[in-house]
């Protein structure tokens, strides 16, 4: 459909996601940000031995640096959502890049472990969090039909950067020491600012016109008749009074939209993701030590993680391509369930691996399933809540995941110390992932069956299926039709005309039954005078 003319007071059509063009630049920026966010906390572990010597602390003390980074990445999700909704993605990412870089640079001058916690842990972790979440939001803004593929390609940044940052950190440590390495790594993090700079708002050129059109549209709704800003009305004493149109006050923008908790699909996803995170990260954390306990040499044991990373690089884009197929995308939640089930069964089957060949086979299948989970997790969330509410949804989901991250891996480590047996831990972690998969699949199936019994309202998107732009265009088109019907030209302001108009309005109010009450149909955009046209269409993908 063509765009409405803002100068005529009509609402302009929404800007369609280009699914390409500048979106590929945004995708590359998201690829880099995802790589830094997930790989950096693991890459700094190459400096731990030197930090232990200089600060005279144990391994568990230095490991808190990575833990604090991850806690900031997950736990500050709602804060990031509020900042994005208030200031936009680009300013937040620029600030985040400066914070991340400053944290590592300041860490190179620290004299004790506590200062490292505050600089490399808190500052750098917060900076990466302020980059990670907005980059995903922008990716969902620029891609709609190709969004599964875009998510898969962006998620591939994690294994690519993990396989490159760790060797780079080792080289920097040998040539410049840990302080010089921290300085250079801080400089690398300034690339986050570059990635933030390319996150151009999709509606930058339309924002001012849209606000102007909205103001005119609301003003015309409030006019008594005819579309004039003032209208003379004759009174009994022969004088004239003017009746001015009053503009409705604008509703404040929600900094954090908690209405997504009314979406049962979001609740199902959140519970499933919490259970998943309890066991998902346990096998790769314990894999090297598990291999060493079975008699595998140190170099070969470390190579197992490289196998997982290499397979992961190709698994994520491939899974994104599969999820984008027309016959797969409406059922992306079931594909996500299959990926989790595949991952959990891999953990369970590998629990009794007793030689290097068995561990290599485990790493191949774990890399495939782990890549599938990484490629689909945010695509499913976008399909559930839509791009408009994704900024709030991802912040709340990451906050809930933070608790699971703090519970799962530490608890597994304590069980290993107590039982001296890795087999039980792999069984437990795999069972948690399988439980998450079964819960998501069964809950989705039950909710879909319930939805089939009750006919859904019109324009309600199917589960994880259609694009966001189609329903947005239909809402704006409906608003334009109401606007063109209601805005009739004036026929005069004499006393007889005004009386006739007032009588017609009175009859119309009586016929409406509720005196101008707004229609309450879900997703319907009302253009009647005095009605709130800011209703939103709830996306209930499940």
UniProtKB/Swiss-Prot annotation:
Gene Ontology cellular-component annotations: apical plasma membrane; basolateral plasma membrane; plasma membrane
Catalysed conversion reaction: (S)-lactate(in) + H(+)(in) = (S)-lactate(out) + H(+)(out)
Disordered, as annotated region: 226-247, 453-542
Assigned keywords, A-Z: Cell membrane, Membrane, Symport, Transmembrane, Transmembrane helix, Transport
GO terms, molecular function: monocarboxylic acid transmembrane transporter activity; symporter activity
Keyword presence, Transmembrane: yes
Pfam families: MFS_1 (PF07690)
UniProt main location, coarse: membrane
Annotated compartments: Basolateral cell membrane
Signal peptide annotation: none
Tissues in which the protein is found: Retinal pigment epithelium.
Residue spans, topological domain Extracellular: 41-63, 115-119, 174-181, 287-301, 352-357, 414-423
Cytoplasmic side: 1-19, 85-93, 141-152, 203-265, 323-330, 379-392, 445-542
Transmembrane region(s): 20-40, 64-84, 94-114, 120-140, 153-173, 182-202, 266-286, 302-322, 331-351, 358-378, 393-413, 424-444
Compositional bias segments (type: Acidic residues): 468-478
Mode of membrane association: Multi-pass membrane protein
Positions of region (Basolateral sorting signal): 465-510, 511-532
Coiled coil: none
Family affiliation: Belongs to the major facilitator superfamily. Monocarboxylate porter (TC 2.A.1.13) family.
Functional description taken from the UniProt entry: Probable retinal pigment epithelium (RPE)-specific proton-coupled L-lactate transporter. May facilitate transport of lactate and H(+) out of the retina and could therefore play a role in pH and ion homeostasis of the outer retina.
Domain commentary: The two basolateral sorting signals (BSS) are required to direct SLC16A8 to the basolateral membrane.
Name of the featured protein: Monocarboxylate transporter 3
Organism: Gallus gallus
Record lineage: Eukaryota, Metazoa, Chordata, Craniata, Vertebrata
Encoding gene (name): SLC16A8
């Amino acid at each position: 459909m063509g765009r409405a003319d803002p100068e005529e007071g009509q609402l302009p059509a929404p800007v369609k996601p280009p699914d390409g063009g500048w979106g590929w630049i945004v995708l590359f920026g998201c690829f880099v940000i995802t790589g830094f966010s997930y790989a950096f906390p693991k890459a700094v572990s190459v400096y731990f031995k030197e930090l232990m010597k200089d600060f005279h602390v144990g391994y568990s003390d230095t490991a808190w640096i990575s833990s604090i980074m991850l806690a900031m990445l997950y736990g500050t999700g709602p804060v990031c959502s509020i900042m994005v909704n208030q200031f936009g993605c680009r300013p937040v990412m620029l600030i985040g890049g400066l914070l991340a870089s400053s944290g590592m640079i300041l860490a190179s001058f620290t004299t004790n472990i506590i200062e490292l916690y505050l600089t490399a842990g808190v500052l750098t972790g917060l900076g990466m969090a302020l980059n990670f979440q907005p980059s995903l939001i922008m990716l969902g803004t620029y891609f709609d039909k190709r969004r599964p593929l875009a998510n898969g390609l962006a998620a591939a940044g994690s294994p690519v950067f993990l396989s490159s940052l760790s060797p780079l950190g080792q080289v920097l440590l040998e040539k410049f020491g840990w302080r010089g390495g921290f300085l250079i790594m801080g400089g690398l993090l300034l690339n986050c600012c570059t990635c933030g700079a390319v996150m151009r708002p999709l509606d930058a050129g339309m924002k001012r016109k849209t606000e102007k059109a909205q103001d005119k549209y609301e003003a015309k709704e409030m006019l008594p008749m005819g579309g004039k800003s003032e209208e003379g009305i004759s009174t009994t004493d022969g004088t004239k009074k003017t009746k001015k149109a009053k503009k409705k006050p604008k509703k404040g923008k929600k900094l954090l939209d908690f209405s997504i908790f009314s979406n049962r699909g979001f609740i199902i996803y959140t519970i499933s993701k919490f259970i998943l995170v309890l066991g998902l990260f346990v096998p790769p954390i314990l894999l090297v030590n598990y291999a060493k306990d079975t008699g595998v040499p140190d170099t070969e044991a470390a190579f197992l993680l490289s196998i997982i990373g290499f397979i992961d690089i190709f698994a994520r884009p491939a899974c994104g391509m599969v999820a984008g197929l027309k016959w797969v995308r409406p059922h992306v939640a079931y594909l996500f369930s299959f990926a989790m089930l595949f991952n959990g069964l891999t953990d369970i089957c590998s629990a009794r691996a007793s030689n290097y060949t068995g561990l290599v086979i485990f790493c191949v299948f774990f890399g495939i399933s782990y890549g599938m989970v990484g490629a689909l997790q945010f695509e499913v969330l976008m399909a559930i809540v839509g791009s408009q509410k994704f900024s709030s949804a991802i912040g709340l989901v990451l906050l809930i995941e933070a608790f699971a991250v703090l519970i799962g891996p530490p608890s597994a480590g304590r069980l290993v110390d107590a039982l001296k047996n890795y087999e039980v831990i792999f069984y437990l972690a795999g069972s948690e992932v399988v439980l998450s998969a079964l819960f998501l699949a069964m809950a989705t199936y039950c909710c879909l069956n319930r939805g089939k019994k009750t006919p859904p309202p019109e324009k309600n998107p199917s589960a994880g299926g259609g694009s966001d732009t189609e329903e947005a265009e239909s809402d704006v088109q409906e608003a334009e039709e109401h606007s063109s019907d209601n805005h009739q030209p004036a026929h005069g302001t004499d006393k007889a005309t005004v009386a006739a108009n007032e009588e017609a309005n009175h009859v119309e109010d009586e016929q409406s039954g509720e005196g101008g009450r707004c229609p309450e149909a879900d997703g319907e955009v009302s253009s009647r005078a005095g009605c709130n046209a800011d209703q939103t269409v709830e996306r209930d993908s499940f």
